[in-house]
């Protein structure tokens, strides 16, 4: 469950290292974001000499949360961290590599490019 002011790790090589959620895209009064939701975030930590800089406002899709995700078949998935992938306005990832496991639910939400770059899909 991601809400505004939540810090997230970045799961790609776009240059950002840590994000802070500012807003959840979708409804105007949504309190929490879950896996597959698009958020507006600000970069809190970044790698030097990369296109993305600190305090830059970007969009990101959530790929891992510490809160449990219950599937239709009864399986429960929980990750060790909250992580997101930086995307552009069209929904394509800005990085060329994805780190860590990604949830299968992203495929149903048409983030197929992120799924194809991921080393492991759970």
Swiss-Prot record:
Domain of life: Eukaryota
Cellular localization per UniProt: Plastid, Chloroplast
Keyword Ribosomal protein among record annotations: yes
Family matches, as PROSITE patterns: RIBOSOMAL_L14
Gene Ontology BP terms: translation
Keywords associated with the record: Chloroplast, Plastid, Ribonucleoprotein, Ribosomal protein, RNA-binding, rRNA-binding
Function recorded in the entry: Binds to 23S rRNA.
Subunit relationships: Part of the 50S ribosomal subunit.
Protein name: Large ribosomal subunit protein uL14c
UniProt source species: Cucumis sativus (Cucumber)
Gene (name only): rpl14
């Amino acid at each position: 469950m991601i809400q505004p002011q939540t810090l997230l790790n970045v799961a790609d090589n776009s240059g950002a290292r840590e994000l802070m959620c500012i807003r959840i895209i979708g409804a105007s009064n949504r309190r929490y974001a879950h896996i597959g939701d698009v958020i507006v975030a600000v970069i809190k930590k970044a790698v030097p000499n990369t296109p993305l800089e600190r305090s830059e406002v970007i969009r990101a899709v959530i790929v891992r949360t510490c809160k449990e995700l219950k599937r239709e078949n009864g399986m429960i998935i929980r990750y060790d961290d909250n992580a997101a992938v930086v995307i552009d306005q069209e929904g394509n990832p800005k990085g060329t590599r994805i780190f860590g496991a990604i949830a299968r639910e992203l495929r149903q939400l048409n983030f197929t490019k992120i799924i194809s770059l991921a080393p492991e899909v759970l």
